[in-house]
Curated annotation (Swiss-Prot):
It is found in: Membrane. This is Putative uncharacterized protein YDL041W. Keywords: Membrane, Transmembrane, Transmembrane helix. It is a single-pass membrane protein. Overlaps SIR2. Its main location: membrane. The chain crosses the membrane at residues 76-96. GO terms for cellular component: membrane.
């Protein structure tokens, strides 16, 4: 398991094993690591099928918004604060209605992956 990333805001590199993460994803995208929520700029890494790592930053403005920088696409969280539904093209892979379940009542956000191809 890849532990807490401990990053704040956008970084250019992360000290994680992207090969292992890509193998774990098994052809799908996955969000790895946990980041403490401080309501300012917690971040995590999105691992694409190719093994490339894309950063994600959580920002709150009325309703929280996830911004995934992946092939120029963006994902947005719904106002309910529970699910994120979006269309994302990442390394040639197009994913529709990717649902990430978020837990906001703890010190961490936990992201689950539900992808139908």
């Amino acid at each position: 398991m890849i532990g807490p990333l401990g990053v704040s805001g956008f970084k250019t590199s992360l000290d994680i094993d992207t090969t292992e993460a890509a193998d774990t994803a098994k052809g799908s995208m996955s969000l790895v690591g946990l980041s403490s929520i401080d309501a300012t700029s917690p971040s995590a890494a999105l691992v694409c099928p190719s093994g490339s790592v894309v950063l994600v930053s959580l920002k709150e403005s009325g309703c929280a918004t996830f911004i995934f920088l992946c092939e120029g696409s963006s994902l947005f969280i719904m106002s309910s604060g529970c699910f994120l539904i979006a269309s994302l093209s990442c390394v040639g892979l197009t994913v529709f209605e990717t649902l990430f379940s978020l837990v906001f009542d703890t010190a961490y956000f936990i992201c689950g992956m539900v992808i139908q191809l």
